Amino acid sequence: MTSSTGGGHDARAVAFRRWVRKIYGWEVEVRVESMLEDSSRIGRFGVAFYNFIQKCAPWLHHPYFVLVEGLSYLNRSRVTLGRRYYSEVIRNYKPHLVLSVHDCLNRGYFQEARAILGKENVRCATYCSEYAGGYGYSRNWVEPSVDLYISRTRTAKNYAVTRYKLDPEKIIVRGHFLVPRIYEEKLSAFERHRFITERLGLRSDRKIIFLATGGTGANNHLSLLPAIKQYSETFQVLVVCGRNNEAFMKVRNWKRNNPDLRCHVEGYCNEMHLFMQVSDLVITRGGTTTCSEALHYECPIIFNGLGGVMPQEKLTAKYFLQDESAEIISKPADLERLLMEWNRFPERFRDLKRRFRNMRFKDRPSEVIYDLVDLAHDALPERERPALKVVGE
């Protein structure tokens, strides 16, 4: 179960489906449901309002976050909003595993599935994508009756145990949950040079600043480009605008009027993992998927705090900033200051990159799949459990 609040939750749902297909072929069936927006009008409005806030007024998410926390009481033991749709899905599909990758799809949902199918016939699991604990870590993530709780980091795991009293026996740490191509499509030095010069039309002897955005297109590109332009002899820019066509056209127009700064502009694309490999640093909000790809490819992060930082984004930023492994800006002048410093003292940027590289941890998404499929396997009567064949990894 997922929901399109931002793009990260959907990305992890897609990652689960693709890894299952890669490892087990067609022996394991996966159904992905956008449960919040498909089950009720109120849920659909809440998702749209979240994405509006992310684009236009991140500061407004603080009172919104407090409001959403109330769902933990509303859904304490049953689904309140969208219950009819959810119940129909459970009755018709009869899943052996209900997996939630969204904070608002745990409490009540697991109890409802067990009530319909029988406790012995279904298992329930959560993959929590937060990097750290504290303000922004929603209590809705933690349903105490969960069978398996998967945490991205040990820091976040410890918070779930100490703050929300989750049984330590139910929680494991498994790192990132990225799609298979992230681990498969690694550019060689020659391919990187060719991608920069031919695909992007940029120079291979200048640092590339990646102005990233999520699928919804929240960005401050036009505010940041003038600051980068002042250091056009050292830096060039790769800009992605997501599904924000208005931003795409405005950045394209800015590029035409400012030919001194080398710039490549993209709308929505499926090459983020390639862009990350050719970039020297990325400027992004605290979206967990983009930051996970940046960490995987050792591309240092500047957190975009223009307009405020949303509660969940604070957790990601805190995880990296606590070891001085990233930077954060709240206005364009902050970016200008950083670029001036790195231009005059290149060793300081190298130190940042070294600290960021040290934050990297190894992860094997296939382990998550084995954990979850084994859990689903346990929901079958022992005599009916098929011998699953691994076809790839």
Question: What kind of region is each of these model predictions?
Answer:
Residues 1-393:
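Nucleotide-activated sugar donor-binding and catalytic core shared by glycosyltransferases
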